[in-house]
Amino acid sequence: MDHSAKTTQNRVLSVKMWPPSKSTRLMLVERMTKNITTPSIFSRKYGLLSVEEAEQDAKRIEDLAFATANKHFQNEPDGDGTSAVHVYAKESSKLMLDVIKRGPQEESEVEVSKDGDVFFDISGGSRAFIEEEEARDLLRPLADPRNSYTKIRFSNRSFGSEAAKFAASVLSSIKDQLTEVDLSDFVAGRPEAEALEVMNMFSSALEGSKLRYLNLSDNALGEKGIRAFASLINSQHDLEELYLMNDGISEDAARAVRELLPSTDKIRVLQFHNNMTGDEGATAIAEIVRECPSLEDFRCSSTRIGSEGGVALAEALEHCSHLKKLDLRDNMFGVEGGIALAKTLSVLTHLTEIYMSYLNLEDEGTEALSEALLKSAPSLEVLELAGNDITVKSTGNLAACIASKQSLAKLNLSENELKDEGTILIAKAVEGHDQLVEVDLSTNMIRRAGARALAQTVVKKNTFKLLNINGNFISEEGIDEVNDMFKDCLDKLVPLDDNDPEGEDFEDEDEEEEGEDGNELESKLGSLKIKQGEE
């Protein structure tokens, strides 16, 4: 009898401990609101929420914590409720800390541009899953029939199916007023089936909108993802900017993009960075590029493209006479691709930025590009050719090309093999460049003479901001000389802490010690005139 009574008493206590009363839940909301709005070390770093915003967050946190704890309690029907209370408190504390670290303006950030466009943005704060209840809270301004939003960004949040259903209903009601949509990184961590379902919902909701900007990057789309957005992509006839970066764009996915795009006449920006495109995929992208007469900014970097795909892209780009920015970094074009690009660059006279690092161009490809650019792109501002196995053999042509670009602001030739001779030629080439801001010749087997020549040239320029010659073979004396030149502007010199004074040039192991010989080399090359081509 005593044991039975004790068991009954435990069960009664269990009921009293869980669920908490309404007043207890309201009290927790009040306490969290107070904690969130109290100045702390976190608020000094992330900002302090207003009482109104804190109260909304506190209510949402309590609801989520209660749901989690209640589910825990239901899974342990014989428990006394103690563990559920513990989960309730722990989850509330965790979510409250997330909000404090997130800072204010979490609900949405609204910006009004000069042309009157209104921008709705929920990408701020920590990357997180979003379910229906939070979606209703976050997207409330969009659901207001009086809203005038024309641009939206839903990135950095992962939408579940239920949240997507609500979001889709909202987007469907305002799609006619939207001109820019950013859905980058909006299904992260979701199972493939759910992610594709979410994509389909958003696609259907936005079908028929007249967008000028569409960003679907960072979603690991692949062909399935591209086709999940088929109804949206296929209905866009006025696109000016399309971003498909870090999306698993394979050969088949690239073909799907080509198939689904109904019109490319107005596209000015097209970016495919960091995909698994390969040569066959590059051929499909080339077919898109060929039909983009208005293209101004093309990026296809880190896409595993070899010589065959490089040649296809180069030939397609010949049709883009308005191109200003070209980024093909980190592919395997090789010499053949470089020569094809040279032919293309000769007709792209409006280029202002060229990024061709890590393409395996070697001297032959570099010479071809240099000769082509000598007669093209007179307003070039950025030139990057890092990591292309460039030696002094092709530096003469390259220096002549650089000397002809008086608008050049940024030059990156890092991770090549220019050595002193090539470096001194480059230094002479930029002598008259009054707009030069940044030069990177790190990791180029440069010794004292080359380092001194380049430093002397750039340090006296009023516009100059950063020189990087780290990772070379500069002697201790050379380092001291360079540091002394920059003693009044040390922020303009990347520290030389990775320099190796004992570095060996294995092609010339018998080279004599620096010093007088370095001065002789500098003097000899300094008297050379850089040939800038024949008219």
Swiss-Prot record:
The keyword Cytoplasm applies. Residues 1-115 are annotated as: WPP. LRR repeats lie at residues 208-231, 236-259, 264-287, 320-343, 353-376, 377-400, 405-428, 433-456, 461-488. Residues 497-520 have a biased composition (Acidic residues). InterPro entries: Leu-rich_rpt (IPR001611), LRR_dom_sf (IPR032675), RanGAP1/2 (IPR045203), WPP_dom (IPR025265), WPP_sf (IPR038214). Keywords: Cytoplasm, Cytoskeleton, GTPase activation, Leucine-rich repeat, Membrane, Nucleus, Repeat. It is found in: Cytoplasm; Nucleus envelope; Nucleus membrane; Cytoplasm, Cytoskeleton, Spindle. Residues 493-535 are annotated as: Disordered. GO terms for molecular function: GTPase activator activity. Gene3D superfamilies: Ribonuclease Inhibitor, WPP domain. GO terms for cellular component: cell division site; cell plate; cytosol; nuclear envelope; nuclear membrane; phragmoplast; spindle. GO terms for biological process: cytokinesis by cell plate formation; protein import into nucleus. Its main location: cytoplasm. It is a peripheral membrane protein. GTPase activator for the nuclear Ras-related regulatory protein Ran, converting it to the putatively inactive GDP-bound state. Plays a role in spatial signaling during cell division. Belongs to the RNA1 family. Homodimer. Interacts with WIP1 through its WPP domain. Component of Ran complexes at least composed of WIT1 or WIT2, RANGAP1 or RANGAP2, and WIP1 or WIP2 or WIP3. Interacts directly with WIT1, WIP2 and WIP3. Interacts with POK1. The WPP domain is required for the nuclear envelope localization. PANTHER family: RAN GTPASE-ACTIVATING PROTEIN 1 (PTHR46761:SF2). This is RAN GTPase-activating protein 1.
